[in-house]
Regions:
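C-terminal motif of bacterial Sec signal peptides marking the signal peptidase cleavage site
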Residues: 21-24
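Active-site-adjacent substrate-binding region
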Residues: 52, 60-63, 109-113, 224, ...
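Bacterial signal peptide processing site
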Residues: 26-29
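Second-shell loop/turn segments in exported
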Residues: 56-63, 77-87, 110-115, 149-160, ...
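A non-catalytic alpha/beta surface segment that caps or lines the substrate-entry region
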Residues: 71-131
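N-terminal capping segment at the start of a domain
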Residues: 46-93, 296-307
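Bacterial N-terminal signal peptides that target proteins for export
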Residues: 2-14
Length: 345
C-alpha cells in the first residue's frame, strides 16, 4: 500500500499489493482491509444497476465562459505562490473580493493552530439567492502547498484553476434570482497540510466552515456540495470518489452524459480525503470532482511542473458546464434522491 503523506489528499493505491494478492501472498494485511476498496478500478460502473429517473428542469442549460475562466487562472497564477501566511495568500483573497465586489460576500476569518504556529486564514463565501428554500454549495481551495513555499510552485491546476472556475461560474449566476436553490460559492483556505497530512494538519478552512455552519443551522439547508479540485488538466479524467455520496455522484454522471462528456468522468474509482470530507461527516451530500491523474502517475501534482501549459480551456468548459447542469438537476431532484435507497449506500 502506498499512502503519500506529502500530498494534500490521501490517495490509497494498492497496485503492488493486488498483484501479490493474486499470487497468493498474504503479507501486509494490517492496513489492506481498510484500504482495498480504494485501489483504482478499471471500467468502473458509475451508475446504479437501475438508474434513477431524473425530473426535467424547466430552465435552459447555462454554459460557463471557459476562456474567461482560463484568463482568471492566468491572473491567479501571476500572483505567485499562495501558501498560508504569505503575501500571495492575502493577494488572492483580495483578488476574489474584487471579482465578487457586486455580490453578497461574507468572510469566515479565523486563526489556525498549525505545526508552524498560529496562522491567520479566511474562507470567502459568495451567496446567490434562489427561489427555493435550500442551498447548493460549490467549493474550491485557494491556497498552495506550504512545504513547497521556497520554490516557485504556483499550483496552476491545484488551486488556481478551480478558484478561477468558481469565479467564472459566478458570472453565470449573478444578475437575477436563481430559479431553484440558492447557490453559494465557498473559497476554502488552508486545504493544504502545513507539515504533514493528518486529521489535524489539513483542511483547516473547510473544517472551520463546516463547524460554523453546523452551529448556526446552515448545514441542514444544504442540498448538495460539489467540490472542484484539479480539474483544469488538459488530459481530463475525473475519478469517482468512493468517499462522496453515491446518489450525488450518479447525478453528476447524468449531467456529464447529457452534455456528451461522460467519457471524461468516472472511468476509475478511488478514495479521496478533500475539502468535502468535513461536510460529509455532518451528513451533507457531497461530490468531489477531482482529476487525480495529473501527468503520468500523477507526476505533476505538488511539483513546480504544475503550470499553466498543462491546462486547457476545454477541460474548464467540460468541468464548468457539468457543474451548471448538475445544479439544474439538483434543483428538481435533490429531495427525492436524498430519500431514495441509493442515499443510504
Amino acid at each position: 500500500m502506498v499512502i503519500s503523506h506529502f500530498v494534500n489528499r490521501v490517495r490509497l493505491l494498492l497496485p503492488l499489493l493486488l498483484v501479490f494478492a493474486g499470487l497468493g501472498c498474504n503479507g501486509g494485511k494490517g492496513a489492506s482491509s481498510a484500504a482495498a476498496s480504494s485501489a483504482p478500478q478499471q471500467d468502473a460502473q458509475p451508475s446504479p444497476s437501475q438508474p434513477p429517473h431524473y425530473g426535467e428542469p424547466a430552465e435552459p442549460a447555462k454554459h460557463v465562459d471557459a476562456e474567461r475562466a482560463m484568463q482568471y487562472t492566468r491572473e491567479i497564477v501571476a500572483i505567485g505562490p499562495r501558501w498560508d501566511g504569505s503575501p500571495g495568500q492575502q493577494r488572492v483573497g483580495a483578488y476574489i473580493h474584487d471579482k465578487l465586489k457586486n455580490d453578497q460576500v461574507e468572510e469566515d476569518a479565523f486563526v489556525a493552530e498549525t505545526p508552524a504556529g498560529k496562522i491567520p486564514m479566511r474562507n470567502i463565501v459568495a451567496k446567490f439567492p434562489g427561489d427555493k428554500d435550500g442551498i447548493i454549495v460549490l467549493g474550491s481551495h485557494i491556497d498552495t502547498n506550504y512545504p513547497l513555499r521556497k520554490t516557485r510552485y504556483v499550483g496552476a491546476n491545484d488551486g488556481a484553476c478551480t478558484t478561477a472556475l468558481l469565479l467564472a461560474l459566478a458570472d453565470q449566476l449573478r444578475g437575477k434570482k436563481l430559479p431553484g436553490y440558492s447557490v453559494w460559492l465557498a473559497f476554502f483556505d488552508g486545504e493544504e497540510a502545513i507539515k504533514e497530512w493528518s486529521d489535524s494538519d489539513s483542511l483547516y478552512g473547510s473544517r472551520h466552515l463546516a463547524a460554523k455552519w453546523q452551529q448556526d443551522g446552515t448545514i441542514r439547508k444544504i442540498k448538495g456540495l460539489l467540490l472542484a479540485d484539479m480539474i483544469g488538466d488538459a488530459d481530463l479524467d475525473i475519478i469517482r470518489d468512493q468517499r462522496s455520496t453515491p446518489w450525488l455522484e450518479d447525478l453528476v454522471y447524468e449531467a456529464a452524459s447529457r452534455l456528451g462528456y461522460k467519457s471524461y468522468f468516472f472511468a476509475d474509482t478511488d478514495e479521496i480525503i478533500d475539502d468535502h470530507a468535513p461536510f460529509a461527516s455532518q451528513g451533507v451530500p457531497v461530490a468531489d470532482l477531482i482529476d487525480y491523474t495529473y501527468g503520468y502517475n500523477n507526476a505533476y501534482h505538488h511539483t513546480t511542473e504544475d503550470t499553466l501549459n498543462k491546462l486547457s480551456v476545454k477541460s474548464l468548459r467540460i468541468s464548468g458546464d457539468v457543474i451548471l447542469e448538475a445544479i439544474r438537476l439538483l434543483d428538481v431532484n435533490a429531495d427525492r434522491l436524498a430519500a431514495s435507497p441509493r442515499a443510504s449506500k
